[in-house]
């Protein structure tokens, strides 16, 4: 089977191409990582204070509850998954420690950090640890209290008729905590999520400042090193797992680890394939979708497709060049004020035109894209926002992150899967990841249902591209 993944890059600041280059314009790995050992794990306290003040100002009133994450057990209580802090908590407090919760009073202007100090038993196993008060000062917060006082603070506010603003929970323990604090059944929490808070957090987090841009560029530099390692290791006889292990190690060596589970597969027609047991074969293609997080948890995300034996066949090159042309065109279109859904459609049109030249599609390609026929080959959207999450703020909801009152989600195949459709603005960071996939099960389904009949040449598709 032939499978081509996305040629993916990032759009930063004024929606321009992300550059990670040394002074002479060439990548120099020794220089790129020279200062990595001196990096902090937080911005200065005033950064977080400024963000919280802006959140309060825009929201106007009420109590804003921002719970951090807790440790999550893997297979028994004492053996936990690597800790990952909630990204919104990180944005407003910067503290990458489990068991904290932040409260912002939008009326009084007061910030509070709730948590527990470490016990002597903790210190025996973990060594000396900073106090809750010391941690709070790093975030510009002076008032701290134990978690038992959080419940009392929330109860007092509710009794006074004040609104408690909170975001949609995505972890079970956070759902249960919010349920207990607010007196709302877990299955009913979604009805009480603060839409004003969701929209305000998105509006703040989606516009990256210079500090954040630098962190994302650093994440992209780590991601570059990961993908260069793939290119060095990719050859017949290598097991996918060897490459996956090597690049995951690079992500951890220079940052906080991978930004999502690495996809390293010569069966690239499966979009999110986390099986790494195949032996690479000459004539096949290796798809790698992988990225890294910095120590501050800012993310990168790149996809590349590599011929296992170092040389594309004519068929493979034809498809690859179509994807590359779509990628290049979307970079040209990216600018403040541009609609991201129009960039998606432009990429879709280039893919459709290219496939028509190969005989895989026929007829009027404008009409073909309008009905979503190219989604047989690119069943996903063009890309997504990126920042403290690789799919930035996806937990808050795509209807707030990718769409707004001006831009509503389409039901057309392909466009319906687009995570982001709204206008671009300076400071947004976007991925651009067009791709062509040959997915046998999807081809079977569409052909059986009579979809795109007269537009897609199913006979040619099966005879030359599903081998």
PLM feature spans:
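Positively charged N-terminal leader segments that act as targeting/secretion signals
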Residues: 2, 23-32
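Short hydrophobic targeting helices and cationic amphipathic motifs
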Residues: 11, 27, 34-36
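Active-site neighborhoods and metal-handling regions in enzymes and metal-associated proteins
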Residues: 33-467
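Periodic, rod-like helical contexts
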Residues: 18-21, 35
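Cationic, low-complexity basic patches in intrinsically disordered or flexible, solvent-exposed regions
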Residues: 8, 22
């Amino acid at each position: 089977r032939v499978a081509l993944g996305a040629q993916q890059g990032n759009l930063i600041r004024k929606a321009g191409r992300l550059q990670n280059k040394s002074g002479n314009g060439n990548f120099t790995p020794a220089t790129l990582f020279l200062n990595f050992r001196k990096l902090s794990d937080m911005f200065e306290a005033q950064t977080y204070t400024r963000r919280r003040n802006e959140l309060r100002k825009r929201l106007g009133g009420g109590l804003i509850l921002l719970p951090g994450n807790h440790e999550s057990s893997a297979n028994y209580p004492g053996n936990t998954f690597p800790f990952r802090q909630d990204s919104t908590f990180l944005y407003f407090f910067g503290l990458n420690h489990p068991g904290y919760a932040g409260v912002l009073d939008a009326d009084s202007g007061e910030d509070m950090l709730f948590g527990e100090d470490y016990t002597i038993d903790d210190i025996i196993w973990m060594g000396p640890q900073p106090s809750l008060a010391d941690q709070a000062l790093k975030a510009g917060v002076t008032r701290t209290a134990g978690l038992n006082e959080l419940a009392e603070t929330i109860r007092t506010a509710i009794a006074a008729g004040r609104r408690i603003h909170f975001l949609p929970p995505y972890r079970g323990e956070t759902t249960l905590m919010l349920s207990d604090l607010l007196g709302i059944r877990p299955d009913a929490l979604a009805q009480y999520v603060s839409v004003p808070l969701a929209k305000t957090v998105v509006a703040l987090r989606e516009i990256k400042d210079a500090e954040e841009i630098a962190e994302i560029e650093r994440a992209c530099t780590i991601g570059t090193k990961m993908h260069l390692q793939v290119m060095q290791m990719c050859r017949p006889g290598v097991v996918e797992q060897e490459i996956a292990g090597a690049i995951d190690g690079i992500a951890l060596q220079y940052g906080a680890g991978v930004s999502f589970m690495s996809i390293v597969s010569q069966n690239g027609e499966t979009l999110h394939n986390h099986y790494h047991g195949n032996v690479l074969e000459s004539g096949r293609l290796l798809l790698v979708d992988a990225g890294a997080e910095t120590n501050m948890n800012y993310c990168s995300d790149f996809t590349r497709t590599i011929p296992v034996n170092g040389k594309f066949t004519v068929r493979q090159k034809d498809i690859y060049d179509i994807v590359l042309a779509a990628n290049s065109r979307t970079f040209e279109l990216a600018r403040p004020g541009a609609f991201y859904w129009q960039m998606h459609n432009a990429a879709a049109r280039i893919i459709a035109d290219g496939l028509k030249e190969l005989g895989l599609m026929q007829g009027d390609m404008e009409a073909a894209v309008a009905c979503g026929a190219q989604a047989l080959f690119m069943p996903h959207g063009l890309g997504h926002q990126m920042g403290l999450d690789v799919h930035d703020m996806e937990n808050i909801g795509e209807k707030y992150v990718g769409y707004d009152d001006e831009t509503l989600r389409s039901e057309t195949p392909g466009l319906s899967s687009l995570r982001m459709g709204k206008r671009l603005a300076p400071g947004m960071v976007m991925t651009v990841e067009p791709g062509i996939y040959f997915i046998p099960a999807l081809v079977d389904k569409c052909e059986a249902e009579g979809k795109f009949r007269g537009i897609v040449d199913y006979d040619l598709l099966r005879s030359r591209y599903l081998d």
